[in-house]
Regions:
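N-terminal beta-strand-loop-alpha-helix module at the start
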Residues: 1-43
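A glycine-rich helix N-cap at a beta->alpha junction
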Residues: 49-82
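Conserved acidic residues
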Residues: 61, 88, 146
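Short Gly/Thr/Asp-enriched flexible loops that form oxyanion-binding sites at enzyme active sites
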Residues: 98-117
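Electrostatically charged, flexible surface regions
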Residues: 123-250
Length: 251
């Protein structure tokens, strides 16, 4: 099986320095189980080679770098290269970390190649993809003969980094097969992310239905047992109704 892994660069949440994207490292772990030598592919600037070597340190010999200036659309370069170098499976992380991590690149690539896409994969074995679903559920899908798969951030990080491998690995710089085009976000105005509202924490471990039922249940108490004759009971009831202003004094 020929496997190509699309690699991006993340950004450290504290220092802001470029780093490997953890979700792409998860994709490499899955690719390593499917084939001994998957193809590693990145589109970006050649000046980021030192950061890209972090991927080679996970146990890979070569990484293909399609040189593209900053701010150019990478999808066209990826689609053109993958058309010239077809493979059975294209893997990518669900999204990058701290960069322009919209997660749309795999979808655009799949559309450009006319392939199906399976998202949020946890593992791949025997032609089946285990997909992560909300609330911790899982779903097993039969994988098409050719497709694009995005790897969930819930997939395990199983590869270990070795500095010697990072130094010995080779980065092959390729020229883009298509002319670069301006990215869609070139005219956008970037602003710092605003902190969202803090979510309320649920203090009880009971389910929503249990909490709702508890609110709806009315407790007894405060009632009065009427004793005596019918006339006395009727007078007492009328008195209570007047106190509650449910009955006018004239009546």
């Amino acid at each position: 099986m020929k496997v190509t892994v699309l690699l991006s660069l993340g950004r450290h949440p504290k220092s802001g320095r470029p780093m490997l994207a953890p979700n792409d490292a998860r994709a490499l772990a899955i690719a390593k189980k499917l084939t001994d030598k998957p193809r590693l592919l990145h589109v970006g600037e050649a000046s980021q080679q030192s950061v890209l070597r972090q991927y080679l340190g996970l146990g890979f010999e070569q990484l293909d770098l399609i040189e593209s200036p900053h701010g150019q659309d990478i999808c066209g370069a990826l689609i053109a290269d993958l058309k010239g170098n077809p493979c059975d499976l294209i893997l990518a992380g669900q999204n990058a970390t701290g960069q322009d991590d919209t997660g749309l690149v795999p979808y655009i690539v799949a559309q450009g190649l006319g392939l199906q896409l399976v998202d949020r994969a946890l593992s791949i074995s025997d032609g089946n993809v285990t997909q992560f679903l909300p609330k911790g559920q899982r779903r097993v899908l039969t994988m098409p003969s050719q497709c694009v798969v995005t790897v969930s951030d819930k997939a395990p990080l199983e590869l270990e980094y070795v500095a010697r491998r990072a130094r010995q690995g080779r980065i092959e710089i390729l020229k883009p097969e298509s002319s670069p085009t301006a990215a869609l976000y070139q005219g956008w105005q970037l602003e710092p992310k605003q902190p969202g509202r803090k979510r309320l924490s649920i203090q009880s471990n009971a389910s929503g239905w249990d909490r709702f039922s508890k609110r709806m249940n009315t407790t007894g108490g405060g009632g009065e047992v009427l004793k005596g004759g019918v006339d006395d009971s009727a007078d007492k009831i009328l008195s209570v109704l007047r106190e509650k202003k449910l009955l006018s004094d004239a009546s």
